[in-house]
Amino acid sequence: MKNDINRLLEQSKKEAIKWLNYPIESNYKDEINTLLKEGNEENLIESFHKKLEFGTGGIRGIIGVGSNKINKYTIGLATQGLSNYLKIKFQSNISTAIAYDSRKFSREFAMFTAKIFSANKIKTFVF
């Protein structure tokens, strides 16, 4: 069990360091550096031990920094993946509809998603 935790911790540290090398916003980098320095292994593992999964209900999770949390970068990866699929499946005249609600960051994530679709030449309606 201790070996499993150590393996997860090392894997999580490596993923966190990879994120620090990406061109991400400074507030995300600050949070990652805090996670690495504060020694809270549980938080570091929870944030970075795996990639957020896309299930039948879409992406579900806790908002925060890391590959296993909901944030603009994990939303962006899922959106780019969906864009790639749509362009293969439909090839032209693709359009999407994005709805947001009153939940935390819902509007921001919707607008970020719309920008990614737009960059992929996918017509997007946001409401």
Model-derived segments and their meaning:
Residues 2-5:
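Charged/polar low-complexity intrinsically disordered segments, enriched in acidic residues
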Residues 9-113:
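An N-terminal, well-structured beta->alpha segment
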Residues 111-123:
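Short helix-loop-beta junction
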Residues 126-127:
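A structural preference for short, hydrophobic beta-strand core positions in alpha/beta folds
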